[in-house]
Amino acid sequence: MTMYATMTTLALTSLIPPILTTFINPNKKSSYPHYVKSIVASTFIISLFPTTMFLCLDQEAIISSWHWATTQTIQLSLSFKLDYFSMMFIPVALFVTWSIMEFSLWYMNSDPNINQFFKYLLIFLITMLILVTANNLFQLFIGWEGVGIMSFLLIGWWYARTDANTAAVQAILYNRIGDIGFILALAWFLLHSNSWDPQQMSLLNTNPNLIPLLGFLLAAAGKSAQLGLHPWLPSAMEGPTPVSALLHSSTMVVAGVFLLIRFRHLAENNSLAQTLTLCLGAITTLFAAVCALTQNDIKKIVAFSTSSQLGLMVATIGIGQPHLAFLHICTHAFFKAMLFMCSGSIIHNLNNEQDIRKMGGLLKAMPLTSTSLAIGSLALMGMPFLTGFYSKDLIIETANMSHTNAWALSIILIATSLTSAYSTRMILLTLTGQPRFPTFANINENYSTLLNPIKRLTIGSLFAGFFITNNILPTSVPQMTIPLYLKLTALSITLLGLLTALDLNYLTNKLKMKHPPHTFYFSNMLGFYPNITHRTIPYLGLLMSQNLPLLLLDLIWLEKLLPKTISQHQISASITTSTQKGLIKLYFLSFFFPLLLILLLIT
């Protein structure tokens, strides 16, 4: 029973020595990146054994707790929960990180600080695993803040570039807003439950208040880039491509969705929280898909596809299916990491060119990268029997059978169609047609550190969904019986988007519009949201803060009230004194009347 718990602990602790060696010997050798990559690969192989044992045993979860500290009101402990979610996620995260680290050996080869880069990647992975295995809110918060600060350091890796620094600060600021919600939920549960353990919180809060649930939703919206707190995700593309791959596949962005999954029992009894989660996820998935349609930066297209898929996961939790959302997290990690690697390979070979309009004809120049990019895009669309199909098709079927919200369902279906459209557009513009890049570009993809990770993730994108779905623990939910036309909804919507993209691509080559329509600008400018929040609102605030003191202090007090008023009175007095006519009797009378008035008052 405790064998797999021991082996999991062994796997997790084996990741710590590479970090400790950097403190003992700061002047590391050039073999350090290979050492870190080998450690992560070994840890992945070790983690397969406890996961297999867990699936074979009828154990629901094992919780290992170590007492840490006791205050007057609460007992803090280091508590690790090894259940279905953590045991399935650990091998996926390790496998993807192993591939990304091997890819980084090629991509970051010329970077003088490559050792520090690998250390940051490893700490990023460890903090995510702390978050996944945590069994109390405080420990989860440590992992939560860990992935936040590591994302800040990695996005701003090329710190000499202004855009990279801005993107890193933007990421940390948007996540700070999400952290407000998390800390609000922490304080509420400490006040009302006197506990941060999920089990005790579920028992004591059978009908929980809306405030902590909104706090969790705000935290998830910040970390998983939901609508309103999403601008940091496309900006994070300023970091190195391996960072983007790790950030978007199995670490930072899925942390928010994982938080909602971990505390799903609290939201199940609150219909308003569920509805808000569903609507937020549905709007996000549509908005991100619309934005991806007109982007020309290959990394930003993949970034918006991540945001769209995260919205789909949040919407799935909103219809009460957290297990399906988790399944989509696991399947999504494979093809999303591979899409970023293929993008990085193309960018690197085309001398840092990221505009898909300046690519084309790469199918013959880079056959393996092109094949993997096509497979990853098809898996993202949800093509049958690729990895993405096993989770995406299930989500759409479940949404079809749900009577919760037809509006949200229709939005999800439209977003699915648009996903197919922008993925097809990316394939057509980058891989097919005539080359549109300079002829002197030195294209060479014959590096083992480039090909091996892409091959591994391609195999994962083909078969991982099949293996994961066959190892899902049996649940008490009865099998659904649905009509054939509903079963084929997801596939038909995907094919519709694919055909639309083909048709639009044909029109683009044949017809040239003089002026793009307003809908194009809405999509291309990301719904004008970054311009409004980052430019217009600060500008208006600055303008008001400048004008208000100017009006109150300079114009009114220093000009109108004091100098001008005094001068006006002086002018009036001088006019009065200068208009004397020499009428002595009248002047004496003017003295006499006040004296008479005073005497009357005295008497």
Curated annotation (Swiss-Prot):
Enzyme class: translocase
Entry keywords, A to Z: Electron transport, Membrane, Mitochondrion, Mitochondrion inner membrane, NAD, Respiratory chain, Translocase, Transmembrane, Transmembrane helix, Transport, Ubiquinone
Membrane topology: Multi-pass membrane protein
Transmembrane segments: 4-24, 38-58, 87-107, 114-134, 140-160, 171-191, 210-230, 241-261, 272-292, 301-320, 325-347, 370-390, 407-429, 457-477, 482-502, 537-557, 582-602
Task performed by this protein: Core subunit of the mitochondrial membrane respiratory chain NADH dehydrogenase (Complex I) which catalyzes electron transfer from NADH through the respiratory chain, using ubiquinone as an electron acceptor. Essential for the catalytic activity and assembly of complex I.
NCBIfam families per the UniProt record, alphabetical: NDH_I_L (TIGR01974)
Family per similarity comment: Belongs to the complex I subunit 5 family.
Entry protein name: NADH-ubiquinone oxidoreductase chain 5
Annotated organism of origin: Gorilla gorilla gorilla
Classification lineage: Eukaryota, Metazoa, Chordata, Craniata, Vertebrata
Gene: MT-ND5
